[in-house]
Amino acid sequence: MFRRIIDRIKEAVEYLMSSRLIVLIIVFCLTSSILIGRLFYLQIVRGEDYLENYELQIRKTRTVPGTRGNIFDRNGEVIAYNELAYSVTIEDIIPTDTKTEDKNKILNDTLDSVLSIVEENGDSVIDNFGIILDSSGSYQFAETNETSRLRFVADVHGKSFIDDLTEKEKNKTAEQIVHYLCKRYGLDYSEHDAAYILKMVNMRYAMGLNSYQQWLTTVLASDVSDATAAAIMENQDSLQGVDISEDSLRRYPDGQYFASIIGYTGQISQEEYDDLSDDEKKRYSLSDIVGKSGIEHTFDSVLQGEKGKTTFYVDNLGKVTDTVSMTDPKAGNDVYLTIDKNLQISAYKLLEEKLAGIVLSKLSNVLDYDPSAEKDTKYIKIPVGDAYNSFIANEIIDMKKFGRTDAKPAEQAVYNTFTQKKAEILSELMAQLQNENAPAYKDLSKEMKAYMDYICDTLLKQTTGILMSDKIEAEDETQIAWATQETISLNRYLNYAISKNWIDTSKLGDSAYSSSEEIYSGVLAYLEEYLKEDSNFDKLLYKYLIKSGSVTGAQICAIVYEQGVLPMDENAYNGLLNGTTDAYGWLYDKIKTLQITPGQLALEPCSGGIVVTDPNSGDVLACVSYPGYDNNRLANTMDSAYYNQLNTGRANIFYNRATQEKTAPGSTFKMISATAGLEEGYIDAYTTTYCSGSFNTVTPSPKCWIYPGGHGALNVVQSLQHSCNVFYYQLGYNMGIDSNGNYDSDLGTDKLRKYAAMYGLDRKSGVEIPVSYTHLRAHETRHDL
């Protein structure tokens, strides 16, 4: 048996040796032996050494933005330029397989350290989040526009469209949004104050915008000092992914004079990116800085530089180990405007001085005043109480500083008066709202009416939407009794609104309500809590404290020094405190010298516009909108608090008075009327009209500006020279006479409309910033001609 086995083995060996496979088998055995030996050497013999010196190599490509082009005036004067500055950046280099909890802790610890370093050296982190702190230290949305607010909420929840939001998500308050993000980012908002939490959320949210492409860096602080840059570099080993980069920041010298023309730059939003064409999306990314308004926006494609590209390797710590290739970026093109910089600044200052003069001519040393008693609007005064109130209402001074531990004497005195008054008013309001037999609205004091109006119209309708305006029936008897006749109380009105399902209970919280009484109790509880922290309600309280003299003008003016709005003047400050300096005289002098401007006070009048054109070429030499703003604070990384202040201020600063204001053209239209009269044959160069100061052909009789005087007999040239109204009243009237000798206003206005169109007044002017369409009314009255 064994012999048979041995014979078979011999046969197999003989067959194998004679086969051509033997060569392959030998080669396979040799290579396998070499591979096994090499693995043994690497893993066993040198394994520990290689582990200690291991570096992970990752290939990355990063785009480098081109420098934005400059903007010059017609004479080559710089209006917008770029400046190199240090920025603190972070790149998310934490491995993607790291647990969320661990990753949050690493990032939060890193950002906390960055925040400490930045603030210790006098700088600040980014503040371009959609939520800010109001004057009472509570969270509020930076956007007041509802669509913009919802767009922000959709971005927070990762929704592409506003319509994708649930009702609960749409109704979230700013505080609920912050708490939602704190939970996502692993931040314990109960352990820190609101300001710290908001800064941390700002940085985490900014990083989150780049989460889909982690190799992009996120700016945490821009335009930082050398001290901050040095401190970051010294601690870089303990700050994962944090670095100092040189950025090109947009600068606007004399920004307030040109902001309405130039606009500002900022990071492109998701909505702006989505609106781009497919070709444009190839040139832009979500980290790009683009023009947000004005010339910066209109000529963005011209000003934008061409991006460069760098391809490199990084190790497992994010350090660059090798640069593979580099393409240099190219600078954008410059833009030259027809504007004359010096003329623009001079026109702005001239307009500001003119407005200040008007304010001073109307300013009256009384705290309260009823303008309805005046028969002629030219006699209406501005009570100084309104001016004092403007310091708070328009946030020239910061009322949230009044109650701080380091508050100054005037701040403390005002705050003590305010807290006592607020407690009294809230108690009275709640008592009336709980009283079924509360006085009717018409029987309330003027002050109490203002509080009730604020609660119903501003808070419940506009701000929170609890009282649904679209559900209210305008012809409903109870609605009329409240809104028009004023014969019922707010208690009765709100209870009726509940019975008619005009109240949105989903906005009162998560509680379930089974009866009308429970709903009303829920509304009152909501109001009581909301009003305690409502800065706009606080402003209303201050208004009546000032009107009553409980908070004095001297106290308000002293706070201007205490908060550094004006440089400290010890004599004036002490005089305001001890009563030796008259507050009215102090304010009058500050307005006269433009240390306090009409734009800051936002009294009427507080705004205006000037346009200067070259009559030979049509070039726009100056285009002033007053008041202006500091567009440097909105460019690059937006100052959200400043933006909100501008957006909610009473001066309506973002509205361009020079290009968007719709108003009657006044005497400038006389050239068109004269052209129409000459071309249509109603007058010639020698036709005269006698001006007695009043046009008595119609009743009531419109007056010339020179009334009770008159210009006498004038021809068309003289009528333009003296800007005589009566000449053009008569001309307009004559153009409206039909073939039967009857006056037809449509006939006259059709002729005027024809020539207005010939002058181009029926279309946009062609300037490259937003303008309002000219509207030629279809049916004018004789007084409009």
PLM region spans:
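Flexible glycine/proline-enriched surface loops and loop-helix/loop-strand junctions
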Residues: 328-332, 652-660, 701, 709-714, ...
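Conserved small/polar residues in nucleotide/adenosyl-binding loops
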Residues: 774-783
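Short active-site loop at a secondary-structure junction
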Residues: 333-338, 602-608, 641-669, 685-689, ...
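Membrane-proximal periplasmic segments of bacterial cell-envelope enzymes
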Residues: 1-591, 599-609, 615, 628, ...
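Short glycine/serine- and small hydrophobic-enriched flexible loop segments
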Residues: 352, 675-682, 730-734
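Short, glycine/proline-biased beta-turn/loop segments that scaffold the active-site neighborhood
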Residues: 626, 634-637, 663-725, 761-771
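Short, solvent-exposed cationic patches
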Residues: 93-115, 588-589, 637-666
